[in-house]
Regions:
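Conserved residues at the C-terminal ends of beta-strands
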Residues: 19, 54-57, 114-117, 151, ...
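Structural motif corresponding to the early beta-alpha repeats
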Residues: 57, 73-92, 117
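Short catalytic-loop micro-motif centered on adjacent basic/acidic residues
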Residues: 50-56, 146-150, 172-173, 247-249, ...
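Glycine/proline-rich, positively charged
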Residues: 27, 31, 87-205, 213-219, ...
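N-terminal binding-site loop/beta-alpha segment at the start of enzyme catalytic domains
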Residues: 1-78, 141
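Structural motif
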Residues: 42, 46, 105-106, 166, ...
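Structured C-terminal cap/extension of enzyme domains
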Residues: 49, 68, 187-413
Length: 413
């Protein structure tokens, strides 16, 4: 296992991190807890020392099982990363309650890497108003957290704004060879690294879509490469090739995949790809772009939209859905990002057909017409799904408050 250093603290982290959002399941659909614990320990025994979870993963069970997996001396071998969900925070007391509950659930006295989860522009503004920076300072001072950071799928402009707002230790962004100009992108990666922040990477395989069942035209490119690697290895090595990257998270739930990733992480040095390797990856990237429905490059010249549409983000989700029709999560991700579930609504259906974006587009895309296509394909159930999910999040937060009242916990009142 290779390791990279957190610039501000000198902490040494494995370049491969274990993502705890996709635990293996049983035949009946529940989590296979025994197998999950074996897999987590398999990864740790192989050198992984960074594990990433969150309260919402597996409906709250991810943290519980991770806490159990780190018994028998495994806690001392790793760094735990978990997250504060902004959608469950309405005051400073909620911040305190959620963190203390996580410490109890994870069976630990501190969180090594604590993130504000999936920040959008609006959720970040809300958290600032509620005093998030004072909370982070306090939690670091009393030792409950060691490093403060955030994750986000926001665009580059919002990402930079968040980076500049606080003395963060690290951040977590989506990054892979298809997302160089999407969300924070390469520019955001380099900007954060320039601020001496560690950068953790999520979705290096785009939820597994850059591995496994790739389109035939893409597989043909990998098959012709002089070096034989799996699609997953090509994608992981591309991310690790960037020296600004600290940890690459992989949601591993198969023993063979864990072993493959551990093997690759033994030799994936920054700058280690040859020019012919990069050329092969670029051919695959270009073929993916050719297969996409909309030739949006994510340049952002169309932004800001006067109606509030995240035009590049909507196109990115639309293209992903078209490229990987077997992936049932693409519409859910679209709803989560653009349907108003975790921030302000920014969906294609908001488009007023003003045409301002089309005039600014260097690719000369008929954006207003395409927005109709995106809305038609991606938003059919959004009007029902978003209120239901928001109601579920409200109930989860309410239950936490009720439990606190019943148990008489007023330590942070």
């Amino acid at each position: 296992m290779l390791y990279r250093t957190v610039p501000k603290t000198g902490d040494r982290l494995s370049i491969l991190g274990f993502g705890c959002m996709r635990y293996p399941s049983t035949r009946t659909g529940g989590i296979d807890e025994e197998r999950t614990i074996r897999q987590i320990r398999q990864a740790i025994d192989g050198g992984v020392n960074y594990l990433d979870t969150a309260p919402v993963y597996h409906m709250g069970k991810s943290e519980v099982i991770l806490g159990r997996a780190l018994a028998d001396g495994y806690r001392e071998k790793v760094r735990i990363a978990t997250k504060l969900p902004p959608w469950s925070v309405f005051d400073r007391d909620d911040m305190e309650r959620i963190l203390d509950t996580q410490l109890e659930t994870l069976q630990t006295d501190h969180i090594d890497y604590y993130l504000l989860h999936s920040l959008s522009k609006s959720s970040f503004e809300s958290m600032k108003m509620l005093g998030i920076f004072a909370f982070l300072d306090s939690a670091k001072k009393d030792g409950r957290i060691r490093h403060a950071g955030f994750s986000t799928h926001a665009n580059n402009a919002v990402f930079r704004e968040i980076v500049d707002s606080y003395d963060w230790d690290f951040c977590q962004i989506q990054y892979n060879y298809l997302d160089e100009k999407n969300q924070a992108g390469t520019d955001g990666l380099e900007y954060a690294a320039g601020k001496k922040m560690a950068v953790m990477i999520m979705e290096p395989l785009r939820g597994g879509n850059l591995a496994g069942r790739v389109p035939a035209a893409i597989q043909a490119i990998w098959d012709k490469a002089p070096v034989k690697r799996s699609p997953a290895e090509w994608a992981l090595r591309w991310v690790w090739n960037h020296p600004e990257v600290t940890v690459v998270l992989s949601g591993m739930n198969d023993e063979a995949h864990i072993e493959e990733n551990l093997r690759v992480a033994d030799t994936a040095l920054p700058g280690g790809l040859l020019e012919e390797d990069l050329a092969t990856i670029h051919r695959a990237r270009d073929e993916y772009w050719r297969l996409m429905k909309v030739g949006c490059t994510g340049c952002g010249y169309c932004m800001p939209c006067p109606a509030g549409v995240d035009i590049p983000g909507c196109f990115a989700s639309y293209n992903t859905h078209a490229l990987f029709p077997h992936d049932r999560t693409t519409k859910f991700h679209y709803i989560g990002q653009h349907g108003g579930l975790m921030g302000e609504k920014s969906s294609a259906g908001l488009c007023r057909q003003c045409g301002k974006c089309a005039k600014a587009c260097p690719q000369h895309l008929p954006i207003p017409a395409l927005m109709k296509d995106v809305a038609r394909e991606m938003e059919g159930m959004m009007g029902v799904v978003v209120p239901v999910l928001k109601g579920g999040l409200w109930c989860m937060n309410k239950l936490g408050r009720v439990r606190r009242f019943v148990t008489g916990d007023k330590s942070h009142a």
